């Protein structure tokens, strides 16, 4: 049985993943700190605070597995600094909290094109986040790099609305992927006992494993 920490549970991938975790018999405890209350989620410890770091600090029980599904855009965040806080600082804080509480496996949603040396700000921050997690020397670290995510968001992103039809037609890693499939693969990966070290799942690999 596993005790799980998940951040980003109000997001597209995280929302699907939280519902899957609630119904997963191998999971017996879920901590899901959020900025706003989740509502009626039986069996879920949901500390909430507008400052996610304060909600995260309320998680003190032992943890086995950490899922981080945090992610925004520079437009949504409002500034470069706010984007870095959401997609780098809070992700690293989630990981550090999990390690402190005994977790052995970290699974994180990154993005296709993540590269700490990228000339593109978004990809660079995602790459720097990945490098920060790798530097923590997790026994198991799984990094998911999906392409454009498909699914119903509470607030639609304009670029995704415009380009979603195109990304459905693209080949390989560029082809869009259903957020539910990303969540399904992450859950399956968390239950695999045999792999250790760093596993990076490209968008095409995520689609393949979801089939």
UniProtKB/Swiss-Prot annotation:
Which InterPro entries does this entry report, sorted A to Z?
NAD(P)-bd_dom (IPR016040), NAD(P)-bd_dom_sf (IPR036291), Semialdehyde_DH_NAD-bd (IPR000534)
Q: Which Pfam families match?
A: NAD_binding_10
Q: Where is the signal peptide?
A: none
A molecular-function term among this protein's GO annotations: oxidoreductase activity, acting on the aldehyde or oxo group of donors, NAD or NADP as acceptor
Family indicated by similarity: To yeast YER004W.
Protein name listed in UniProt: Putative NAD(P)-binding protein YraR
Gene behind the chain = yraR
């Amino acid at each position: 049985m596993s005790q799980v920490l998940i951040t980003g549970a109000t997001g597209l991938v995280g929302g699907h993943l939280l519902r899957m975790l609630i119904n997963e018999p191998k999971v017996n405890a879920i901590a899901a700190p959020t900025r706003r209350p989740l509502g009626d989620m039986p069996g879920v410890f949901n500390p909430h605070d507008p400052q996610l770091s304060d909600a995260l600090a309320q998680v003190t029980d032992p943890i086995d597995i950490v899922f981080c599904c945090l992610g925004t855009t520079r437009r949504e965040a409002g500034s470069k600094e706010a984007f870095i806080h959401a997609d780098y600082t809070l992700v690293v804080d989630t990981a550090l909290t999990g390690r402190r509480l005994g977790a052995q496996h970290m699974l994180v949603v990154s993005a296709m094109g993540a590269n700490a040396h990228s000339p593109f700000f978004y990809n660079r921050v995602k790459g720097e986040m990945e490098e920060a997690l790798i530097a923590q020397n997790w026994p198991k670290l799984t990094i998911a790099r999906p392409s454009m995510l498909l699914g119903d968001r509470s607030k639609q992103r304009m670029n995704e609305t415009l380009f979603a039809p195109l990304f459905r037609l693209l080949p390989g890693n560029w082809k869009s992927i259903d957020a539910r499939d990303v969540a399904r693969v992450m859950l399956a990966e968390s239950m695999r006992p045999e792999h250790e070290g760093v596993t990076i799942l490209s968008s095409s690999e995520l689609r393949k494993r979801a089939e």
